[in-house]
A protein has these predicted regions:
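Hydrophobic, Leu/Ile/Phe/Ala-enriched alpha-helical segments that form helix-helix packing faces
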Residues: 147, 151-154, 197-208, 244-252
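Assembly/oligomerization interface modules of large self-assembling protein complexes
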Residues: 34-115
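Extended, solvent-exposed, turn-rich assembly/linker loops in the middle of proteins
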Residues: 169-240
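Solvent-exposed, charged interface segments at domain starts and junctions
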Residues: 1-31, 76-95, 197-203
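Sequence/fold signature of self-assembling virion shell proteins
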Residues: 2-57, 228-339
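Alpha-helical scaffold segments that mediate packing/assembly in large oligomeric complexes
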Residues: 114-195
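Hydrophobic side chains in beta-strands
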Residues: 113-119, 219, 317
Length: 339
């Protein structure tokens, strides 16, 4: 295997921050020490990009365990105009206009996931000799972390291998606006910034058929970090972020409106999901389980390792999940630009 130091970072690679660039071939128990060497009791673990996705996407756990799909019926009225029900009082009986209703199912495909861990007697003895590392618990943690990070990424981006498992940012049914935002918001002049604020909510309200306003604006993390600059030289104490939050809270009449930075919205982190090179994607939406939801029919289960020969032990972690299904599509809107 080539040394990992020779592999440059590329768009679309897993979001992670390792303890430096470590080659798999360098991992092991043996390294040189001398009589004056101290091995610390505490180890430093690898870090990964983490975001509490359930705070941004409604999640339901436990529904549909060990099944293949969940269907949710969407109901519709077909009632015609209000005035079609007006009856004359000076003439004889007339036919009464009727209303009808209907349903249409929306399907959430359920994916079953399982991954194993293994260790043997010799590996245990070597780990014990290192004095400060529990190889078994480390493998269990790695398996659970793989599940957690996988759900996190899927909730926003979906699965590349299965179009029936979309993420919040990758639903093909959602309207994509490519004119309202054409660059980083944090780089706009005061005049262009004011125009953007004026146009954004209007575009969403039109897209929702004038029925709803959003409560969340998710933007690329890089842009979010740049919004702490002053909105203009005349107002140096007011940041662009403060101005936006105040304006959108007033426009939506919702004091809980949130602007959030999400790394998966950055073009470098979503390549291959909806475009080969990705794009900077902004999304206005409602954090409402009737608007969108991710199901986790079976949360992570870690089976204890078992052995058939008292030398090798094998264990399996498993779970089930769906993508982020958007039930009220007009209540979600994407705004794109690509570098």
């Amino acid at each position: 295997m080539d040394n990992i130091n020779k592999i440059p970072w590329q768009p679309g690679m897993t979001l992670e921050n390792a303890n430096g660039a470590v080659a798999d071939t360098s991992l092991g128990y043996q390294y040189a020490i001398q009589t004056t060497t101290l091995i610390r009791a505490k180890v430093i673990e690898q870090k990964f990009y983490k975001i509490p996705f359930a705070e941004y996407i409604p999640v339901e756990v436990g529904t549909g365990a060990f099944l293949e799909e969940i269907k949710t019926n969407l109901t519709y009225d077909s009632a015609g105009s209000f005035e079609s029900g007006i009856q004359g009082t000076s003439s004889g009986p007339t036919q009464v206009a009727q209303v009808t209703v209907g349903t249409s199912p929306k399907t959430a495909a359920i994916v079953t996931w399982a991954k194993g861990y293994q260790y043997n007697l010799v590996e245990l003895k070597k780990a014990l000799a290192s004095n400060n590392w529990d190889v078994v618990s480390s493998k269990m943690k790695a398996l659970k972390r793989n599940w957690d990070l996988g759900l996190q990424e899927t909730s926003f981006l979906g699965l590349k291998s299965n179009s029936n498992v979309p993420g919040l940012l990758s639903n093909s049914e959602v309207t994509v606006d490519t004119t309202t935002i054409t660059g980083y918001i944090s780089a706009l002049s005061y005049t262009d910034f004011a125009t953007f604020v004026k146009n954004l909510m209007a575009a969403y309200f039109t897209n929702s058929n004038s029925t709803e306003l959003p409560d969340t604006f998710a933007i690329p993390q890089i842009d979010y970090l740049g919004l702490e600059v002053p909105v203009s030289p005349q107002f140096p104490m007011v940041s662009m972020l403060d101005y936006l939050e105040k304006a959108f809270k007033r426009a939506t009449q919702n004091p809980n409106f949130k602007i959030v930075g999400i790394a998966y919205c950055d073009q470098v982190n979503n390549a291959g999901y909806w475009a080969a090179n990705g794009s900077n994607r902004y999304v206005l939406y409602r954090r409402d389980p009737e608007t969108l939801k991710m199901d986790i029919p079976v949360d992570f289960i870690l089976n204890p390792a078992a052995t058939a020969d008292n030398y090798n032990w094998n264990g399996v972690g498993l779970g089930q999940f769906s993508g982020t299904i958007i039930y009220r599509v007009p209540e979600v809107m994407y705004f794109n630009w690509a570098a």
